[in-house]
Amino acid sequence: GLAPDRNSYRVKGEVGLGFDISQRLYGVATIGYLTRKYRDQVPQLRDVSSLSYNINLLWNPTEYLTVRVNGLRDIQETASPLVAGDQFTRGTVAVDYVPTPALLFTASANAVHYNPVGVTTGNATEYGGSLLGRYRLNRRWSVTSRVSYNGRDTNSPIDSFDGIWVSMGIVLTL
């Protein structure tokens, strides 16, 4: 058929550093290079080479507040017969606040930029954020509520969207 053979080999080399600064700031950061080569065929999928990195930070400025920051650049698989994969860059930030042992608030934001490898269209940026509240009734039961926003900007109006979601629930922990 016309579907390409997706067999490939991938090599990724990274070096990194892990740290703990005064038991308040923890982190792991790596940087490297990756390459993926597809077998010679018709249609040919484009080989991919790119800078890669992964950053994870956790900061506890107080015993009630935690800030998490993550960044990643990599290549993910795709099922498209025209595209070798999506090169993506992702960043997230989340803040947890625990004013009492029974109450948790989380605010988070994220953004991801996708760049399909092998075509000039299809770039997309997805972004979003959420607010979460959880009240723990006891060791097994809690009540949660979340408001989330997500959106996508692309050069194709069919694939762009914006949405707001609201959810509430009761959680049983086994």
Enumerate the language-model features and the residues they cover.
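Acidic, glycine-rich loop-and-beta core segments that form the ion-binding/anion-interacting portion
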Residues: G1-N54, L58
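Transmembrane beta-strands of outer-membrane beta-barrel pores
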Residues: V11, Y33-K37, G71-E77, A111-N115, ...
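Hydrophobic, lipid-facing positions within transmembrane beta-strands of outer-membrane proteins
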Residues: V11-V15, I31, L51-I55, T89-V93, ...
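Residue-level signature of outer-membrane beta-barrel architecture
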Residues: V15-F19, Q23, W59, Y97, ...
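Repeated loop/turn-to-beta-strand initiation elements of outer-membrane beta-barrel proteins
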Residues: Q23-A29, E63-V69, P101-A107, Y135-V147
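C-terminal structural cap/anchor segments
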Residues: V67-P116
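Outer-membrane beta-barrel "beta-signal"
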Residues: G133-R136, S142, D162-L174
